[in-house]
Amino acid sequence: SVTPKLAFHLLSVVKFEDYLRLQQSLVADLAAGGDCIKVLICEHTMELTVGRKGSHAHIRIPQTEREKQNLQTHWLPRGGGAILHSPGQLAVYPLVPLQWYGWSPGRVLTMVRDAVSMALSQVGIATLCYDGLHSVWGRTGMLAATGISVQQNVSCFGSYINVSPAMGLFGYVDTAWQLPADQSRRTMSSLMAEN
């Protein structure tokens, strides 16, 4: 077993299209033989992303409101559904050269979810994780959504942790496309609401 090498990069608020260009460049570097897991941490401007499990039906923000907010929508080849991004939500992107470490995409997905859950417990937030699901739930609802993809044998994308975003539009985006048995509603929440 190889001991992972990690490099953390703290970015600021980044437009999603700018992040995608950066991710593409880093994936190419890692695919060319890199052995270091690069973890990018940032916030995004208010934008929507939709993964492979998402659809137009998961976005119920009226078109007039989307235009008023200048809300861009990006259809992505990552797992998961629709996610609303905004400042106050922490995006954590572990770019892992899978072949170097011998990890499967499923293992990385579970590791990311578990790392988020452990980090939140370290700051006093009780979390719930469910077998077969990769979101992190708290007392008040879903706290973090996770979705990855693999490009050139490197994991991309990651987890989105709601720390203190303005929650107004979150109710119009169905991020929780699959609900755990003991969660009765598709509620996105935040770490601030947990306190």
Describe the residue ranges of each PLM region.
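N-terminal lobe of the biotin/lipoate ligase/transferase fold
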Residues: S1-G138, M142-L143
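A residue-level signal for conserved active-site and pocket-lining positions in enzyme catalytic cores
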Residues: Q23, I41, G158, M188-L191
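Short, conserved beta-strand/beta-arch hydrophobic-aromatic motifs that form part
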Residues: A57-E65, L71-Q72, L143-V173
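A structural signal for well-ordered alpha-helical scaffolds and beta->alpha junctions
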Residues: L109-R113, V163, S184
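A hydrophobic, small-residue-rich beta->alpha segment in the mid-to-C-terminal subdomain
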Residues: G168-N195
